């Protein structure tokens, strides 16, 4: 009799678990989705299901096209134990002259599910990786920190990068934004399939850092974003940053064609056909020809404003115009920056040149008017060279006065980079959203320097104080290889608070957001900018005036 009761209870429990998804009691590694069955890996305190295709390979005739949903039916169990591959890229953080990484067939998602005996279902965090729209990948943003906390399912996404993902002639024939369209399809995949992994499709939070943060904002500017996500966070990147929506993309597209042997193309149709015939390695390796020095500008290929008649156009107006018209998804959004975000890419100016032994920053004294428009992304937005030179002169006077560029004046150069490339746009975007939006808008600034970060990596030195640079906050959420595994006690606390913040935001039933003991203040309806300051000592809500 007891055996019968036990079996009945077991069956009831199995039914309850089955109703929540396809994670079975007997074999949680075996998942069934519309394409068939897949098997993941048991990693001790979490399960992983990696490199699951969400789109057909963007190769051959599908190169430079809107991604097609993955339709293949698996006759055998799909092996989801292999790590995700990188999309083909010219990677800034590879030493040496050959910076080529990855493959063209790369449109996959990876799902990480914690083992947690206290819950069967989890809120979901979908991460769009950063990398200037040019490099990076899901495998470079580690999942161990989030899995350690055991409170959310994490999904990472691979999407096309560089010229393969963002080349554009500005018309319907080669519209661009293929990487953004990949992201969109992946988010739809998550919404439709995450319940099979024990995720809660009604509690999906989309986050991203740098270009990933800008991607999150661009995704949110589509009115249908609320169909795939509940809330969003843009860390140190949003669509109003000057390196996101750029002019001059059409010229770069045809220059790319000339470099790879499509110089005879005089129209978009011919150019596209020719580029499809070229090896992907040649197209991606051509990135080096668009760099003035080192990895400057860091985004030669990025998002474009598409023609309204482009196939499945992603964005057809400038983000500012979209926000002012109120034609964007009304979901809670948080946007952030670090106090010295401009350490990317300013720190590379402190690298000592092998030939002369002096820092690149010294060369700015003679090359400022040549390099500044590329470093700060106004090369294609000025009408005349005089306008460009006048602006370059104004910036130098504002931040350095009469001082020369040197190691001693580096801090002010970095401050310039922080303001122009990251910080100013946070104020502008929050101001616009509070005026023209309805859903809550939150903001925070992080000020707590890491022992090793982007500043040290780019400059190759540890004798300079960089402050809290680009990534110092996010790298406490997504562990990366160059950040020390042994974090300070204050960083451990902050890491846990950040991850708890993600869970809280994903689960919130009233659109509120909290970090530690601090509740974020909503900017909508506020006369002042509501900014949460996060430091090693805790958190504090501050009010600022809305001006640049």
Curated annotation (Swiss-Prot):
Membrane spanning residue stretches: none
Disulfide bonds: 87-106, 262-274, 518-539
Residues annotated as the enzyme's active site: 210
E.C. no: 3.1.1.1
Top-rank taxon: Eukaryota
Keywords: Disulfide bond, Glycoprotein, Hydrolase, Secreted, Serine esterase, Signal
Signal sequence, start to end: 1-19
Annotated InterPro entries: AB_hydrolase_fold, CarbesteraseB, Carboxylesterase_B_AS, Carboxylesterase_B_CS
Gene Ontology cellular component terms for the protein in this record: extracellular region
Catalytic function, reaction form: a carboxylic ester + H2O = an alcohol + a carboxylate + H(+)
GO molecular function: carboxylesterase activity
Residues with attached carbohydrate: 95, 116, 479
UniProt subcellular location: Secreted
Homology family: Belongs to the type-B carboxylesterase/lipase family.
PANTHER family cross-referenced by the UniProt entry: CARBOXYLIC ESTER HYDROLASE (PTHR43142:SF1)
Entry protein name: Esterase-5A
């Amino acid at each position: 009799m007891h055996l019968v009761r036990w079996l009945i209870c077991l069956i009831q429990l199995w039914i309850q678990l089955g109703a929540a998804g396809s994670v079975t009691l007997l074999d949680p590694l075996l998942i069934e989705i519309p394409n068939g069955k897949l098997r993941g890996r048991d990693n001790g305190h979490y399960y992983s299901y990696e490199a699951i295709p969400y789109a057909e390979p963007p190769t051959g005739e599908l190169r430079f096209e809107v991604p097609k949903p993955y339709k293949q039916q698996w006759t055998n169990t799909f092996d989801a134990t292999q790590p995700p591959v990188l999309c083909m890229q010219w990677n800034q953080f590879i030493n040496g002259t050959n910076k080529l990484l990855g493959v063209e067939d790369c449109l996959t998602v990876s799902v990480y599910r914690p083992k947690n005996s206290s819950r069967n279902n989890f809120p979901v965090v979908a991460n769009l990786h950063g990398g200037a729209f040019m490099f990076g990948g899901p495998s470079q943003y580690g999942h161990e920190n989030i899995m350690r906390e055991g409170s959310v399912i994490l999904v990472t996404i691979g999407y096309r990068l560089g010229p393969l993902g963002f080349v554009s002639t500005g018309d319907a024939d080669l519209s661009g934004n293929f990487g953004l369209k990949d992201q969109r399809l992946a988010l739809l995949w998550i919404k439709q399939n995450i319940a099979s992994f024990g995720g809660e499709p009604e509690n999906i939070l989309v986050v991203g850092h740098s270009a990933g943060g800008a991607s999150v904002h661009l995704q949110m500017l589509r009115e249908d974003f609320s169909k795939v996500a509940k809330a969003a966070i843009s860390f140190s990147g949003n669509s109003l940053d000057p390196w996101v929506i750029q002019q001059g993309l059409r010229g770069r597209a045809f220059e790319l064609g000339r470099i790879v042997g499509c110089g005879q193309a005089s129209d978009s149709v011919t150019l596209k056909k020719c580029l499809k015939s070229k090896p992907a390695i040649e197209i991606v390796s051509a990135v080096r020809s668009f760099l003035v020095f080192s990895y400057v500008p860091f985004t030669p290929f990025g998002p474009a404003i598409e023609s309204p008649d482009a196939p499945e156009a992603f964005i057809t107006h400038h983000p500012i115009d979209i926000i002012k018209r109120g034609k964007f998804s009304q979901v809670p959004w948080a946007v952030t920056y670090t106090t010295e975000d401009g350490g990317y890419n300013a720190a590379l100016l402190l690298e000592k040149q092998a030939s002369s032994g002096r820092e690149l920053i010294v060369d700015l004294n003679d090359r400022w008017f040549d390099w500044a428009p590329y470093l700060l992304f106004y090369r294609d937005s000025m009408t005349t060279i005089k306008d460009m030179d006048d602006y370059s002169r104004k910036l130098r006077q504002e931040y350095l006065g009469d001082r020369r560029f040197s190691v001693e004046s580096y801090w002010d150069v970095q401050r310039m980079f922080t303001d122009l490339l990251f910080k100013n746009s946070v104020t502008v975007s929050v101001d616009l959203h509070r005026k023209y939006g309805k859903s809550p808008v939150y903001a925070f600034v992080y000020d707590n320097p890491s022992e090793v970060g982007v500043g040290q990596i780019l400059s190759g030195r540890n004798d300079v104080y960089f402050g809290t640079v680009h990534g110092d906050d996010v790298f406490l959420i997504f562990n990366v290889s160059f950040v020390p595994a042994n974090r300070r006690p204050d960083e451990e606390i902050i890491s846990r608070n950040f991850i708890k913040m993600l869970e809280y935001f994903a689960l919130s039933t009233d659109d509120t957001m909290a970090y530690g003991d601090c509740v974020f203040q909503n900017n909508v309806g506020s006369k002042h900018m509501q900014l949460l300051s996060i430091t090693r000592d805790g958190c504090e809500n501050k009010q600022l005036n809305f001006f640049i």
